[in-house]
């Protein structure tokens, strides 16, 4: 699918200017291992869409901060506008991860 077809499909399916698009595999996974071609990130950049990153936080501790920071840095300034921590184990786990990620600027 070319750029014009992608833009046309996006316009058709986001009539209210809001859309939720689920990527395949990971945010940067596409046709090539060394660039964004065919990835969800390529589409987001093409359409100038913000990314809300959903992260599986099960069995995660402070290291999740480094993982999220890597995504934010790879995406570039302003591309990722928020993070949802999914599959939290408990309220204590949520509190712990919020503290671990508190210094992150998104």
Predicted regions and their residues:
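ATP-dependent carboxylate-amine ligase catalytic core
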Residues: 1-47, 55-82, 91-95
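GTPase G-domain guanine-specificity segment
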Residues: 85-106
């Amino acid at each position: 699918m070319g750029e014009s077809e992608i833009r046309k499909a996006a316009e058709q399916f986001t009539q209210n200017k809001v859309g939720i698009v689920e990527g395949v595999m990971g945010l940067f996974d596409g046709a090539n291992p060394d660039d964004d071609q065919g990835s969800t990130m390529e589409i987001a950049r093409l359409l100038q869409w913000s990314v809300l990153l959903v992260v599986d936080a099960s069995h995660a501790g402070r290291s999740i901060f480094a993982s999220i920071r890597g995504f934010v840095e790879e995406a570039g300034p302003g591309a990722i506008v928020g993070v949802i921590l999914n599959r939290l184990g408990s309220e204590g786990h949520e509190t712990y991860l919020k503290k671990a990620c508190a210094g992150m600027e998104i």
